[in-house]
């Protein structure tokens, strides 16, 4: 009798587990079927309105009153809206665009101010990043303008360098031309020297005697001496004339004699 009483709860437990497994298999099959027919039924789904919402509410009440085994095989998935009333609530929540599993339902309403604070901090960080972005853009614009100015300066310097190089080339060409002309003149000079004959030296017999040279030197000396004396006489005559003029302008006690300076 005790064995029968112990076996009955075990059998009941096994029956419960088997029913749960069958329900889970049916739920998974229905979910797969709903996913496969979702694309085909999108065109037939009508927009939600008040009538459809009321109908769904009535169906919900009827489904709650009935047993799962009675209605689960009689429902046509294509006749139901996709997201209005899903059969398996947990799986519909997973398939929705909002992942409700990540929402911490176990936390209270005290966490919402923290979220608002986080949003405020995120907004302030976003504003700071925007301000930094504007600053970086301004700095990049300034650097770009400076780089453009430097590039223009570099181009101008390159132009000057090219001009100087061209001028150096012109000067080198002129220098080569002058050197070539000098070489030609040196060649002509060498040819002229070769073409001319050296003069013959005078012999000792043809040279003048020493007495004649001395006489010529004496004549030259006398000539220069006579010129010197003549100039000296003319100078003394001019001096005497000037003295006479001064004597007539300034009266003195004694008349100056010729060749003597007047006394005041």
From Swiss-Prot:
From the UniProt record, which GO molecular function terms apply?
Answer: identical protein binding
> What happens on changing residue 172 to Q?
In strain: Au1, Au3 and Au9
Checking InterPro entries in the record gives: Male_ac_gland_sc
Pfam families found in the cross-reference section? MAGSP
Question: Impact of altering residue 79 to N?
Answer: In strain: Au2, Au3, Au8, La13, La32, La37, NC-004, NC-006, NC-008, Ny4, TW1, TW5 and TW8
Q: What is known to happen upon mutating residue 5 to S?
A: In strain: La28 and La106
Return the annotated region ranges for Disordered: 189-219
Q: Where is this region: Necessary and sufficient for homodimerization?
A: 219-264
**Record annotation: effect of changing residue 104 to R:** In strain: La62
Signal peptide from the UniProt entry = 1-18
Q: What induces it?
A: Up-regulated in response to mating.
The listed outcome for residue 167 to S is: In strain: La36, La54 and Ma20
| Tissues with expression | Produced in the male accessory glands and secreted into seminal fluid (at protein level). Detected in the main cells and secondary cells of the accessory glands of 1 day old males (at protein level). In 5 day old males, confined to the secondary cells and only reappears in the main cells after mating (at protein level). Produced in adult males 3-4 hr after eclosion, levels increase reaching a peak at day 3-5 which is maintained until at least day 10 of adulthood (at protein level).
* Modification after translation (UniProt): Glycosylation. Undergoes several cleavages as it is secreted and is further processed in the recipient female. The precursor molecule is proteolytically cleaved by the seminal metalloprotease Semp1 at Lys-48 to produce CP1-N and CP1-C.
**How changing residue 10 to L affects the protein?**
In strain: La120
What does changing residue 42 to V do? In strain: Ma18, Ma20, Ma37 and Ma53
Q: Where in the cell is it found?
A: Secreted; Cytoplasm
Biological process (GO), any one: positive regulation of octopamine signaling pathway
Outcome of swapping residue 24 to K? In strain: NC-005, NC-007 and NC-010
Sufficient for promoting ovulation when expressed in females: region residues: 1-138
Asked whether the keyword Cytoplasm is assigned, the reply is yes
GO cellular component: a single term: cytoplasm
| Compositional bias ranges of the Basic residues kind | 194-203
Designated name of the protein: Accessory gland-specific peptide 26Aa
Q: Specify the species.
A: Drosophila melanogaster
Q: Recite the lineage of the species.
A: Eukaryota, Metazoa, Ecdysozoa, Arthropoda, Hexapoda
């Amino acid at each position: 009798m005790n064995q029968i009483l112990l076996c009955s709860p075990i059998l009941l437990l096994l029956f419960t587990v088997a029913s749960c497994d069958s329900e889970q298999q049916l739920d998974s099959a229905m979910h797969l079927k709903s996913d496969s027919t979702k694309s085909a039924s999108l065109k037939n789904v009508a927009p939600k309105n008040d009538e459809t919402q009321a109908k769904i509410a009535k169906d919900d009440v009827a489904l709650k009153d009935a047993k799962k085994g009675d209605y689960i095989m009689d429902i046509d998935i294509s006749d139901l809206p996709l997201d209005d009333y899903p059969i398996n609530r947990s799986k519909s929540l997973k398939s929705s665009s909002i992942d409700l599993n990540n929402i911490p339902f176990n936390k209270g309403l005290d966490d919402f101010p923290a979220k608002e604070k986080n949003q405020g901090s995120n907004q302030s960080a976003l504003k700071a990043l925007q301000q930094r972005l504007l600053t970086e853009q301004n700095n990049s614009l300034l650097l770009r303008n400076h780089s453009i100015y430097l590039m223009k300066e570099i181009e101008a310097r390159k132009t000057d360098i090219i001009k100087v190089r061209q001028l150096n080339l012109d000067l080198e060409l002129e220098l080569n031309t002058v050197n070539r002309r000098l070489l030609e003149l040196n060649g002509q000079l060498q040819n002229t020297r070769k073409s001319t004959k050296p003069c013959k030296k005078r012999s000792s017999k043809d040279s003048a005697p020493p007495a004649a040279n001395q006489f010529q030197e004496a004549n030259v000396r006398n000539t220069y001496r006579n010129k010197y004396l003549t100039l000296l006489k003319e100078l003394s005559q001019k001096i005497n004339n000037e003295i006479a003029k001064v004597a007539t302008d300034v009266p003195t006690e004694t008349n100056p004699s010729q060749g003597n300076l007047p006394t005041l």
